Amino acid sequence: MGYPGQRPVIPPQSHRDDRETLVSEHKHKGKTCRQSAAVFNVVNSIIGSGIIGLPYSMKQAGFPLGILLLFWVSYVTDFSLILLIKGAALSGTDTYQSLVNRTFGFPGYLLLSVLQFLYPFIAMISYNIITGDTLSKVFQRIPGVDPENLLIGRHLIIVLSTVVFTLPLSLYRDIAKLGKISLISTVLTTLILGIVVARGVSLGPHIPKTEDAWIFAKPNAVQAVGVMSFAFICHHNCFLVYGSLEEPTVAKWSHIIHVSTLISVFISILFATCGYLTFTGYTQGDLFENYCRNDDLVTFGRFCYGVTVILTYPIECFVTREVIANVFFGGNLSSVCHIIVTVVIITVATLVSLLIDCLGIVLELNGVLCAAPLIFIIPSACYLKLSEEPRTHSDKIMSCVMLPIGAVVMAVGFVMAVTSPQDCSHGQEMFYCSPDNFSLTNISISHFQLTTQLSILNVSIFQ
């Protein structure tokens, strides 16, 4: 793992333009990764558990407004990720925490440390929830397996996946080693996207649309921004990825972020659109909860997504561990402490995830309480205080816009999430999966076969 001593120190830029190249003052002792690996790490961090809730955010905001908000959140994410590195250049720091400490002192440092720990920690909890929900349904489709068997229950699956997969992967000390794993995760996400699109075409026409399906805007738009922020945020680990680059520069980082954001927004828009258009007002926080259990194609998608979040989990654990290392151990962990801290973090996250089974509220609260300040407020505040650019500079204007919007999203979103919680139908089959609904009883068959059967049924009725 790239702890502060293993990353390049970003030199102060007080006498240089903040767009200039950042050059390391000493040889980078940690392992480095190529730009392509960095892109996959960033995309994998963005396209984590949050993407599964994007169709749900369309339901909350209203589909037309939801699409516009998703583009806006992606632009703000791109801008603020680059802004953070510019702020680091101005302050001569090499971590998010040291940047805020240099800018706002110890109180700011503590606040950021709490947020930077809570966001990935809650993300780890959501990953466990998704793993338990998705893989339990996968195992239920195995011939001869009793769906009520405790050995395929979500709780045991969460524990086993943690012990066998996520814990060993999280024990790595160097994030660059996860580049190939992130590539695998990105490929699996593409397969999942294809399945959601295919089911949008074959399944969507047979599910009744809700009355408010096409309303432009809905009252829960602020909560929707929270879910989108949860999906797009990767600010908590951007310094880890930046520090793993060979000869990191602002220009190189900007290119990586632009490419990563474009890939992520394309996948996100397509996923959100197809998912929402299929189920409209019935869309759940976990999109896979909407599909019928006897759909074998979606079962394969559940398996792919379960693997994806398992592979994404270690990146979030890296960040939580680094926060603890910086706050309590001066930025360096011995081998023994490294193992102990990792095991404690993962154990607590696992225990919490065993007690919670509704993903929607987790995405909302993490989005408005942690993601919003990390994306909108803190990068803008740091840059505004550090930069000596004129007030009319584009970066300063955008920062002035982002800061108050982030505060509104954080405050209003939290109040609405607590006072107006959304329904959660966890573990229940949706009404359209009933055997009485002929068009969906054999969902795993092709769209052509489904259409043919419906036509035959209509003919027999008229006869």
From Swiss-Prot:
Briefly state the protein's biological role: Putative sodium-dependent amino acid/proton antiporter.
Q: Which UniProt keywords apply?
A: Amino-acid transport, Glycoprotein, Ion transport, Membrane, Sodium, Sodium transport, Transmembrane, Transmembrane helix, Transport
Q: List the disulfide bonds.
A: none
Q: Does the keyword Transmembrane apply?
A: yes
Q: Report any Pfam family annotated for this entry.
A: Aa_trans
| Protein topology in the membrane | Multi-pass membrane protein
Any one GO BP annotation for this protein: sodium ion transport
Biased composition, class Basic and acidic residues, residue ranges: 14-25
Q: Where in the cell is it found?
A: Membrane
UniProt key word Calcium: no
Q: Which family does it belong to?
A: Belongs to the amino acid/polyamine transporter 2 family.
Q: Which residues are glycosylated?
A: 437, 442, 458
The entry's protein name is Putative sodium-coupled neutral amino acid transporter 11
Q: Which GO terms describe its cellular component?
A: membrane
Task: State the residue spans of region: Disordered.
Answer: 1-27
Q: Please, which domain of life does this record's source organism belong to?
A: Eukaryota
GO terms of molecular function: L-amino acid transmembrane transporter activity
Q: Where exactly are the transmembrane stretches of this chain? A: 38-58, 65-85, 105-125, 150-170, 178-198, 225-245, 256-276, 298-320, 336-356, 358-378, 397-417
Q: Return the InterPro entries for the record.
A: AA_transpt_TM
